[in-house]
Curated annotation (Swiss-Prot):
Keyword set, alphabetical order: Autophagy, Endoplasmic reticulum, Membrane, Phosphoprotein, Transmembrane, Transmembrane helix
Source species: Homo sapiens
Annotated localization: Endoplasmic reticulum membrane
Chain intervals with Acidic residues compositional bias: 275-285
Family in the record: Belongs to the RETREG family.
Cellular compartments per GO CC: endoplasmic reticulum membrane; membrane
Gene designation: RETREG2
Protein name: Reticulophagy regulator 2
Segments for region (Disordered): 254-287, 336-394, 411-486, 504-543
Motif LIR motif mapped to chain: 490-495
Top-level taxon: Eukaryota
Oligomeric form and interacting partners: Interacts with ATG8 family modifier proteins MAP1LC3A, MAP1LC3B, MAP1LC3C, GABARAP, GABARAPL1 and GABARAPL2. Shows higher affinity for GABARAPL1 than for MAP1LC3B. Interacts with CANX.
Biased composition regions of type Pro residues, renumbered to the chain: 461-480, 512-524
Lineage, uppermost ranks: Eukaryota, Metazoa, Chordata, Craniata, Vertebrata
Any GO MF annotation of the entry: endoplasmic reticulum-autophagosome adaptor activity
Domain-related comment: The LIR motif interacts with ATG8 family proteins.
Length: 543
């Protein structure tokens, strides 16, 4: 019992799987059968087209020259011949339409002409075809037929005729099948079509309809062969687009005017309409005067140029960083050392000043702590031995100055103010730029002035640029860039030759000391000698 129940459950469980597999199998078989049936139909259609084309080719292979000439006339390859043929056909048509002959007589005459041509064709038109009927699409046949490459050969024409005939037969079979399946609908549609033709024949004569059909047959090959419709559309497209845009603009203007009148009608008091019209015209004239005409191309070009330009702040930052900046271009990196070695031009004062400030800052922020611990007694023979080198360096440095008034910033790190009313600049160590350097520079180039580090306190109020004295060992923090600019403009004072000599006399210095370039700190034993001389000057200046 249990085993039987288990077998029953197994059969019940396998039922849905079996049904699904059967359904899938049936669907696949139906799909495959439909695909095979479509393939068979296509193969049968192609075979039927081939048979019919071969039959037509066998009948028309003797008329290849006539068919080629007819194609040339229909496509107007020779306009004069085509024009004469069209005039002859029109005259023949109107002659037959105006005659009292019956249509059956015309039909019989047409059939008689056909049979006579078929009978006399071998005598007047010899057979020039040499290919077999199994190969109606060979190239040798088209060449022998006399047809041009852009015209249809007889095999191609036969194939097109066969396809058209089979398509007509298929539509006719579908129509008959529709008649058998839906007789009522078929009757209604046929009756409506006949009624339309009756109305058309009542208003338009039959002879005119026939003439329109004849003209269509004569002119349609010309239109298709030369693509007249496409050429006409290509030439008329700009005019149509312009007309469309103008109509849209006029419609938008009318719509805007209508909405404006509605708003004015709602807001205006219940008075006459004439003042409203005058106000509207005046407002429109004013608005037209305040609305300029914007050229789209010029606006886009202006925006593109504005976006590519750099602001003044960006240009100054890039120039100070060693970049060659030009408007509406990308910055190009240049060699900073070459810019520093070249002579500064008068047209670039800001660049020269910023470079000098940077050099002064580097020299003043590095106090020679290792030199301060060394012995202070140094010989002056080393200074005498290097006088010639220092003179050459001083002359080269003074020649590189951009203007007669070359300022050196001296307000970064101060070492205390000396007594006797003499205020020293809060610069670094005094040996960086000593008064001997200033006096030597003045003797070397009288037209060039460099301010000394210590200024005579002639002003009653202390200058805000003077910082409180700090110890020599502790470095002074750097001020902000804004404070640097303000202090740079306020710390300098021009002194004449008499004040400089008085200052040298108070410090007890000799004016014959060789000059030292202001923008480069002294090297070697000169530093120790200058330190010793500065200490002696401070000892003499103390009370």
């Amino acid at each position: 019992m249990a085993s039987g129940g288990g077998g029953g459950n197994t059969g019940a469980g396998g039922g849905p799987g079996m049904g699904l597999s059967l359904g899938l199998g049936l669907g696949l078989s139906l799909g495959m059968s439909e695909a095979t049936s479509e393939a068979e139909e296509e193969a049968a259609t192609a075979e039927a087209v081939g048979r019919l084309a071969t039959t037509l080719w066998l009948r028309l292979r003797g008329w290849e020259a006539v068919l080629a000439a007819a194609q040339r006339l229909l496509v107007w390859e020779k306009p004069l011949h085509s024009l004469v043929t069209a005039a002859a056909l029109n005259g023949l048509f109107w002659l037959l339409s105006s005659s009292s002959l019956r249509p059956f007589f015309l039909l019989s005459v047409s059939l008689l002409a056909y049979f006579l041509l078929d009978l006399w064709q071998p005598r007047f038109l010899p057979d020039v075809s040499a290919s077999s009927p199994e190969e109606p699409h060979s190239d040798s046949e088209g060449a022998g037929s006399g047809a041009r490459p852009h015209l249809l050969s007889v095999p191609e024409l036969c194939r097109y005729l066969a396809e058209s005939w089979l398509t007509f037969q298929i539509h006719l079979q579908e129509l008959l099948q529709y008649k058998r399946q839906n007789p009522a609908q078929f009757c209604v549609r046929v009756c409506s079509g006949c009624a339309v033709l009756a109305v058309l024949g009542h208003y338009v004569p039959g002879i005119m309809i026939s003439y329109i059909v004849l003209l269509s047959i004569l002119l349609w090959p010309l239109v298709v062969y030369h693509e007249l419709i496409q050429r006409m559309y290509t030439r008329l497209e700009p005019l149509l687009m312009q007309l469309d845009y103008s109509m849209k603009a006029e419609a938008n203007a009318l719509h805007h005017k209508h909405d404006k009148r509605k708003r004015q009608g709602k807001n205006a008091p219940p008075g006459g309409d004439e003042p409203l019209a005058e106000t509207e015209s005046e407002s429109e004239a004013e608005l037209a005067g305040f609305s300029p005409v914007v050229d789209v191309k010029k606006t886009a070009l202006a925006l593109a140029i504005t976006d590519s330009e750099l602001s003044d702040e960006e240009a100054s930052i890039l120039e100070s960083g060693g970049f060659s900046v030009s408007r509406a271009t990308t910055p190009q990196l240049t060699d900073v050392s070459e810019d520093l070695d070249q002579q500064s031009l008068p047209s670039e004062p800001e660049e020269t000043l910023s470079r000098d400030l940077g050099e002064g800052e580097e020299g003043e922020l590095a106090p020679p702590e290792d030199l301060l611990g060394r012995p202070q007694a140094l010989s002056r023979q080393a200074l005498d031995s290097e006088e010639e080198e220092e003179d050459v360096a001083a002359k080269e440095t003074l020649l590189r100055l951009s203007s007669p008034l070359h300022f050196v910033n001296t307000h970064f790190n101060g070492a205390g103010s000396p007594p006797d009313g003499v205020k020293c600049s809060p610069g670094g160590p005094v040996e960086t730029l000593s008064p001997e350097t200033v006096s030597g520079g003045l003797t070397a180039l009288p037209g060039t002035l460099s301010p000394p580090l210590c200024l005579v306190g002639s002003d009653p109020a202390p200058s805000p640029s003077i910082l409180p004295p700090v110890p020599q060992d502790s470095p002074q923090p750097l001020p902000a860039p804004e404070e640097e600019e303000a202090l740079t403009t306020e710390d300098f004072e021009l002194l004449d030759q008499g004040e400089l000599e008085q200052l040298n006399a108070e410090l007890g210095l000799e004016p014959e000391t060789p000059p030292k370039p202001p923008d480069a700190p002294p090297l070697g034993p000169d530093i120790h000698s200058l330190v010793q001389s500065d200490q002696e000057a401070q000892a003499v200046a103390e009370p």
